[in-house]
Amino acid sequence: MANTTSAKKATRKIARRTDVNKARRSRVRTFVRQVEEAIASGDAAKAKEAFLAAQPELARAASKGVLHSNTASRKVSRLAARVKALSVTTTA
């Protein structure tokens, strides 16, 4: 339990920041899930559209410190590869 005033304030700030970060992380997961669902359905156009929406969300999460920048880059890279592979298989 925080005893000093500054420690109590720090606890309040941490709680607020935790709530914001949870919301951001949830938002990122939603966008990534939409891309994965579009890939699973086999719709290349929908997958590309979802990927283009997810990419800035991942970048924003990385810039805000919710995700490590390497983690965000890895997720973007892997999703891009899957979307590209899907578009190649549907056109060929």
UniProtKB/Swiss-Prot annotation:
Keyword RNA-binding listed: yes
GO molecular function, one term: structural constituent of ribosome
GO cellular component: cytosol; small ribosomal subunit
One Gene Ontology term from the biological process aspect of the record: translation
SUPFAM superfamilies (alphabetical): Ribosomal protein S20 (SSF46992)
Alphabetically ordered keywords of this record: Ribonucleoprotein, Ribosomal protein, RNA-binding, rRNA-binding
Annotated stretches, region: Disordered: 1-23
Domain of life assignment: Bacteria
Gene3D superfamilies: Ribosomal protein S20 (1.20.58.110)
Matches recorded under InterPro entries: Ribosomal_bS20, Ribosomal_bS20_sf
Protein family per UniProt: Belongs to the bacterial ribosomal protein bS20 family.
Function, as annotated: Binds directly to 16S ribosomal RNA.
HAMAP family: Ribosomal_bS20 (MF_00500)
Protein name: Small ribosomal subunit protein bS20
